[in-house]
Amino acid sequence: MASDEKLLRGEQTQAAIVQAAYRLFIQNGYHGTSMRQIAREANLAVASLYNHFESKEQIFIAVLERYHPIFEILPNLSRTDTSDVSEFVHRAAQFIANHLDQRQDFLNLFFIELVEFRAVHIPRLLEKNEPLLTSFIQNFVAKKSNLRPFPPFVLARAFLGMFFAYYVTRFIAGNNPTLGGEAHVLDDFVDIFLHGILLEENEA
C-alpha cells in the first residue's frame, strides 16, 4: 500500500514538472528556460527534478508527448466514419482546424521543436505512436475512390503538410481577403489537395 502511494506521488510530481515546464517553454522557449525556473514553477527543489528526469531535454520530450496536438488529433481522424475520400479529407481538415483553434500554443511548441531541436524528436514520437498513424493512413486509403497510386505515407505527409501550410499562413493573412484570409479558404486548400491547380481539359 505504501509503495502504491509512493508511486502515485511520483507520478503526480512528474505531471507537475511537465505542466510547469510546458508553460515556461511556451513562454520563453527551450533555451530561455532553466531547470531552476522549472523547479520554481513546480514548487520543487532543483534536485527533485533530477529524481524524475535526467535532463531538461528529457523534460521537453515529456512535454511533447503530453501536449503535442498530433497525438490528440490522430485517434479522432482514424475514427472518422465516411466511405468517400473527399468527404473524409474535408471532415479531417475541419476537425484539425477546430482543434488547433483551441490550442493557440501549438505553433510555439512546434517551432521550439523545429528551430531549437531541428525536429530531432518527432520521428521517435511518431514511431512510439505508430499504431495511431498507421490507423489514420489506412482509414485514408481504404476509401472507395480513384486515388492515384501514391505510397500511403506520402499521401498522409502531403495532407498534413497542406494543413500546416494553411494554419501557418492563416496567421499571416488574418482576415484580409486580398491575402486569402476569407473564412472559406480552408475548403480551397482541401480542393487544391484533392484536385490540384490545373483545370481538366473539359473544364478549360
Give residue spans per PLM region:
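Amphipathic alpha-helical packing segments from all-alpha helical-bundle domains
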Residues: F71-E72, N98, A119-S145, F153-V154, ...
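Hydrophobic/aromatic-rich alpha-helical bundle segments in the mid-to-C-terminal region
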Residues: V141-D191, E200-A204
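Amphipathic, non-transmembrane alpha-helical scaffold segments
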Residues: G10, V18, L64, V89, ...
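Helix-turn-helix
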Residues: Q12, A16, A20-Q58, A62
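Amphipathic alpha-helical segments that line or abut small-molecule/effector binding pockets
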Residues: Q19, S86-I112, F153-R157, D187-H195
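Amphipathic alpha-helical segments used for helix-helix packing
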Residues: L100-V120, V168-A173
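Amphipathic alpha-helical linker/stalk segments
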Residues: V63-A92, L133-A142
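N-terminal intrinsically disordered/low-complexity leader segments
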Residues: M1-Q12, N76, E201-A204
